[in-house]
Curated annotation (Swiss-Prot):
PANTHER family: CLASP (PTHR21567), CLIP-ASSOCIATING PROTEIN (PTHR21567:SF9). Residues 1-38, 317-477, 489-668, 721-750, 810-835 are annotated as: Disordered. This is Uncharacterized protein DDB_G0280205. GO terms for molecular function: microtubule binding. Residues 7-37, 328-351, 361-395, 489-510, 522-629, 641-664, 724-750 have a biased composition (Low complexity). Gene3D superfamilies: Leucine-rich Repeat Variant. Residues 826-835 have a biased composition (Acidic residues). It comes from Dictyostelium discoideum.
Length: 835
């Protein structure tokens, strides 16, 4: 793009012409007086250059011009004449002096004031002077170009045409005259102005001039300005003004000539519309820009063709299920031969939601219908005579469950339709000795092998003018609106078998081998919440159904409030206790065991109760009632036997069930051995007290050592004394119960099981449990005279050792202090001698 300069630039010394302005040749109201004639036509002005002999005369003349610029009291014509004189000085030999740069720096502020003047004539002459400076000084004007550019860029968006056009032309002259590396950033910032369309349009021209000069000359654009340049071009390409967008396209192709690689990447950031519009200026491009444009266009065309081929290949979507249809059909035929009652779906046109269309088949039936269906099922095939399917008037879809091994199409003429719009379910109802589920809202077809027997179901006739009264086997949401079909009641045997099949698997009880006592199951006691007076056992742990199963359970009944055994097991305020089911051991025992081994888990529970000091209150020997545990004896039979001698259920007892519990005890008294739990509790409480005393002594010793700052190794806890005490207690208990041999043997075996559990679980975690602060103090803890007497000497020895260590440390400190005092005395004596 070629830029035109102002005609005020002199070409020779005799440049004064006698051409008159159009206004002088024509009247003042002539239409030929245009802006272009006023800008680019010369009036009768003396533009002859002024030459000076020395710098003093030049300095004096410039001072006079500056004084005229700053004198605002006089008319504006004096400033106009001063500007014309400045133009003559610039055309002269004044710019050749060495001090011209400093002189120009002194007059620049005054000249910039004239550029921002409100009077258009003054601004036009000032712009002509600045253009002349750039043309004459070339690169020497570069230090001054930035400050003049910043002043001129503010005059570009002015609405006065003479001012804006003069400033615009002056800026283009400066860009053509000097290096633009320091000026580009000013135009880039102005091009992003969102409020001034005229300024964005002018800045796009300035950017194009800078890019054009950068193509011809090096060093016109700084590398640091490239990101801002790309951002500016991208914004200008989508500007609201068409002229601005057009100039921005030229800027892009000029930028592509500078850096082809960056321009290609920059091109991908544009929208498809912007990319397409970039090629609208292809006809006006020349040289390398045109070559790059054609190359980019060809590459885009190839990419488009490749993308089209990819899309065509994606349209060829093969469904692998089509290739597997034959295999699926073969598999279905094999399954039908193996299972004669397998359900197959008839091939019917898709309706309802599956197809999106409401298809209704034509029916040839009359409003009054009498339907008789006879279905005969044989082991090989199923034959149906006068088969009539019932379907409601729904367009939602059809769900078919036909018990047949032969596929046959659905006869639309035999379909009876109701007014319901809820859908339909077609199926053959088969009743037998042990058929499908009974007594439900929706009938389900059974696929069990029992249905192989020939069965016949004759539906009742229904005569009505409405199809809703036709016989139907549907119920629930798929039933007709008018009436529902009368379903035949199942037999007692089929109901029992269905109920048995629907229940979860039953936990079978262990079979006890022959011996004095059966294998002892684990008895666990659960807490009953006060909110529910009766708690029922879960079906997964105990069997309370009507099925005939074998189970061995332990029932604990109580007619009076139970005495609390330990703090871990508490009774409900209402007085109801719940016993859970007995757990079956993994393997059957080959040797008989004593009945006292059934309390292994109970003993572990009572051992855990020793962690809290509240168990000391459980030593009372009197109770309101005696607790008794009843264990049912069963003879050894096969696991598949279904008739045990006794079947017991776990029950929840309340305070009002006195007579019931008493009668149940009498009925089971023949096969039950009684165990006195009180004797067991006494022995357990004594053992627990011994263990608690031993652990408490160890804790108190550790706390004393910690207070005195001494660390001892953690001592492992041994329960040898506990075992000896257990033996003594068991002997005393056996002597006290000499009249009852069975009781004595059960108690001794029970204590033996306690010793086994205690020796196995040596690793206690007593420190994690809570201990009353009142039991831990500096005094010796005397829980028992006999048990804790052995620990007092140990504590005394520890105290003596600690006192000895403290005394030795104090003596050492006193000795060190005496030595320091002696040294201080010696130093004081030396100081006195010196003085």
């Amino acid at each position: 793009m070629k830029t035109s300069r102002l005609s005020t630039v002199p070409t020779s010394s005799s440049s004064t012409s006698t051409s008159s302005s159009p206004s002088s040749s024509s009247g003042s109201g002539s239409s030929t007086n245009t802006v272009g004639s006023r800008l680019f036509t010369q009036t009768k002005v003396d533009n002859s250059p002024l030459d000076f002999e020395n710098e003093k005369e030049l300095q004096k003349k410039l001072d006079d011009i500056v004084s005229e610029f700053r004198n605002k009291d006089k008319e504006w014509t004096f400033r106009l004449k001063a500007l014309q004189i400045l133009q003559r000085i610039i055309n002269g030999n004044g710019i050749e002096f060495k001090g011209w740069s400093s002189m120009l720096r002194s007059i620049s502020p005054a000249l910039i004031e004239q550029l921002t003047e409100l009077r258009s004539t003054i601004v036009k002459e000032a712009c002509a002077s600045v253009s002349l400076l750039g043309f004459r000084m070339k690169s020497k004007f570069e230090p001054f170009a930035l400050q003049y550019t910043q002043a001129l860029i503010r005059m570009v968006p002015v609405k006065t045409t003479i001012i804006s056009e003069s400033a615009h032309q002056t800026l283009k002259d400066i860009l053509e005259s000097v290096s633009t590396k320091n000026l580009l950033q000013t135009f880039l910032d102005a091009s992003l102005d969102q409020h001034n369309e005229q300024l964005r349009k002018r800045c796009s021209e300035y950017i194009y001039i800078v890019l054009s000069r950068a193509i011809e000359n090096d060093g016109m654009i700084l590398v640091s300005s490239v990101p801002a340049l790309e951002k500016s071009i991208q914004k200008l390409l989508i500007d609201g003004a068409s002229e601005t967008r057009q100039m921005a396209r030229y800027c892009f192709w000029a930028y592509s000539e500078l850096n082809e690689k960056s321009a290609t990447l920059f091109y991908t950031h544009f929208t498809p519309t912007t990319q397409k519009n970039l090629f609208t200026v292809q006809e006006h491009l020349k040289g390398d820009q045109l070559e790059f444009c054609e190359k980019l266009k060809n590459s885009l065309f190839e990419e488009e063709q490749h993308q089209k081929m990819v899309e065509d290949s994606n349209d060829l979507d093969f469904d692998l299920n089509d290739f597997k249809k034959d295999n699926n059909n073969n598999n279905n035929n094999d399954n039908n031969n193996n299972n004669n009652t397998s359900t197959t779906r008839s091939k019917t046109p898709t309706t309802g939601r599956a197809s999106g269309l409401k298809i209704r088949s034509s029916t040839n039936t009359t409003p009054t219908t009498t339907t008789t269906t006879t279905t005969t099922t044989t082991p090989n095939k199923t034959q149906s005579s006068s088969s009539t399917s019932l379907r409601s008037g729904s367009s939602i879809g059809n769900r078919t469950e036909v018990s047949s091994s032969i596929k046959r199409p659905l006869d639309a003429s035999n379909i009876i339709r109701s007014k319901s719009s809820l859908g339909t379910t077609r199926k053959d109802v088969i009743t037998g000795g042990s058929g499908g589920g009974g007594g439900g809202g929706m009938s389900t077809s059974s696929q069990s092998p029992i249905s192989k027997t020939p069965t016949t179901m004759i539906t009742k006739t229904a005569s009505s003018s409405s199809p809703n009264l036709a016989t139907s086997t549907q119920s629930g949401r798929y039933s007709s609106i008018g009436t529902r079909a009368i379903t035949t009641s199942l037999s007692k045997q089929s109901s029992s078998s269905n109920l048995t099949r629907s229940l979860p698997p039953i936990i079978k009880s262990p079979i006890s081998p022959p011996g004095p006592t059966p294998p002892a199951p684990t008895l666990t006691k659960s807490k009953s919440t006060p909110s529910s007076p009766l708690s029922t056992p879960t079906p997964s742990k105990l069997s309370s159904s009507t099925n005939t199963t074998t189970s061995t359970s332990t029932t604990t009944t109580s007619t009076t409030p139970t005495r609390r055994i330990s703090s871990s097991t508490t009774s409900s305020p209402i007085g109801s206790t719940t016993t859970s089911a007995l757990k079956r051991p993994s393997t059957l025992t080959s040797t008989p065991k004593s009945s006292s081994s059934s309390s292994s888990s109970s003993s572990s529970a009572t051992l855990s109760s020793t962690k809290t000091p509240s168990t000391t209150a459980t030593n009372s020997t009197t109770s309101s009632a005696t607790k008794k545990s009843f264990i049912t004896k069963t003879n050894p039979t096969d696991e598949q036997t279904t008739t045990p001698k006794s079947i017991t259920k776990t029950t929840t007892t309340t305070t009002t069930a006195n007579s019931t519990s008493t009668s149940s005890i009498k009925r089971r008294s023949d096969n039950v051995d009684e165990i006195d739990i009180e004797s067991l509790e006494i022995s357990l409480n004594q053992d627990n007290k011994l263990a608690f005393n031993e652990i408490s002594d160890e804790i108190s010793n550790n706390l004393r050592d910690a207070k005195k700052g001494l660390s001892f190794y953690e001592k492992e806890l041994t329960l040898d004394d506990l075992e000896n005490n257990n033996n003594n207690n068991s002997n005393s208990n056996s002597n006290s119960n000499s009249n009852n041999n069975s009781k004595r043997s059960s108690v001794s075996s029970f204590t033996n099981s306690i010793k086994e559990s205690t020796t196995a679980d040596v690793d206690f975690n007593w420190l994690e449990d809570s201990v009353h602060d009142s039991l831990i103090d500096d005094d010796v803890l005397d829980f028992d005279e006999n048990n804790n007497s052995t620990y007092i000497p140990r504590n005394n020895n520890n105290n003596n050792n600690n006192n000895n260590i403290i005394k030795e440390q104090q003596e050492q400190q006193e000795g060190e202090q005496q030595e320091e005092r002696q040294q201080e005395q010696i130093l004081d004596e030396d100081d006195e001698l010196m003085f």
